[in-house]
Amino acid sequence: MFPRYPRYLWRNTQPKINVIQTPPLRVLSDYQIKIIKDSWEILNKHPVESGQAIFYTFLKRYPEHKKRYPAFRNMTLEELKDTPQIRHHCSRIMEFFGAAIDSLGTEQQRDILVTALSDNADYHGKKGITKEHFIQMRNVMLEVISGACKLDDEEKKAWSDLMDIMYHITFNVLDALNK
């Protein structure tokens, strides 16, 4: 005879798993690459300030992530503005994206993107950064870039396709780390 369990245990008690799908690996057209590079020039005129706008918006929208940064976890968002730590971190973010964007349309594009994004995903994945965190950053980046550069729908699509490429590589590395 099977043991008797309370009725509430008969239901499937497994937690629902929210699986974030890996975006497709897209191919950017020459025109999309031009759109991305032209709008990046706008952001790159003031790279640290652009990086701060992205990172500050990210932390404002998702304050729980501030605890992941020991250098400024105990500061308020207002205290964070223009601190050397935040300026340094934001300049690194912009350098990372700048190198990726500079590689677009070159013969080295694939190698540069795969290497840089794999290293970045490996580093962040080992610190417990998940696909959900990357999606949150993606949404903030697209919003800030779109606003700063006044992108139309076609330009937003180009940036979204670039993010799909970047996150395709990133998510494959994160999946490998979690096996």
Predicted regions and their residues:
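Globin-like tetrapyrrole-binding proteins
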Residues: F2-K179
